[in-house]
């Protein structure tokens, strides 16, 4: 790896009208340690972008910065701009909870509430004051349909979500996240705990979801990135090295380091 010039970058950009979210000079620190090193990146609307790189490359830390999940870590500090609809959501006066309604998150392992399937979807809406059962029913059905789960659970909505399979639980978590109608859905290795069949079902769900949402996914699975994304960004040691169309990254990467990583020669 000593032969690579890590200062050499190739970063795709988009016309402003196509951009759903962007970052400018984003750094993330854990105490005095710099985990993310000044990343400029744009995400195209209604596309799936995969973030890849070795363990410790910073891709999950960067993803978590996009809706300020790093705020939950006492020693974490994020600098730079995270721009959504022209607003820097990294500013201290931003209401983080309101912002996360627009930029949602699905975590690595399914984390359904210990409630019914129905109340997993309605819980946040009920807390926000929605009481009309017809409205709640519509939210549940629409969200579960979008997450490709409705047909499997429509007769069991009042059963515990914990009785679902791992793949079904993850799609329920997706349904819960999209029920508040975010523009952007962040996914941190959402298939890592799933078997191959559930993984394929999740990817098929993602293809449908991108009609209505912009999806940014972290994955260690090169085959998944190649299959399921429109764009791919390669991270290494806290830096974005190459960002381009997925087909280009996997078939004709501009940088030797990227080509060697996706072909399994290091990492």
UniProtKB/Swiss-Prot annotation:
ATP binds at residues 53-60. One of its GO terms (biological process) is phosphate ion transmembrane transport. It is a peripheral membrane protein. It is found in: Cell membrane. It comes from the Bacteria. The lineage of its organism: Bacteria, Bacillati, Bacillota, Bacilli, Lactobacillales. PROSITE patterns: ABC_TRANSPORTER_1, ABC_TRANSPORTER_2, PSTB. Disulfide bonds: none annotated. This is Phosphate import ATP-binding protein PstB 2. It catalyses: phosphate(out) + ATP + H2O = ADP + 2 phosphate(in) + H(+). Part of the ABC transporter complex PstSACB involved in phosphate import. Responsible for energy coupling to the transport system. The keyword Iron does not apply. Keywords: ATP-binding, Cell membrane, Membrane, Nucleotide-binding, Phosphate transport, Translocase, Transport. Its EC number is 7.3.2.1. SUPFAM superfamilies: P-loop containing nucleoside triphosphate hydrolases (SSF52540). The keyword Oxidoreductase does not apply. Residues 21-262 form the ABC transporter domain. Belongs to the ABC transporter superfamily. Phosphate importer (TC 3.A.1.7) family. GO terms for molecular function: ATP binding; ATP hydrolysis activity; ATPase-coupled phosphate ion transmembrane transporter activity. GO terms for cellular component: plasma membrane. The complex is composed of two ATP-binding proteins (PstB), two transmembrane proteins (PstC and PstA) and a solute-binding protein (PstS). Gene3D superfamilies: P-loop containing nucleotide triphosphate hydrolases. It is an enzyme of class 7 (translocase).
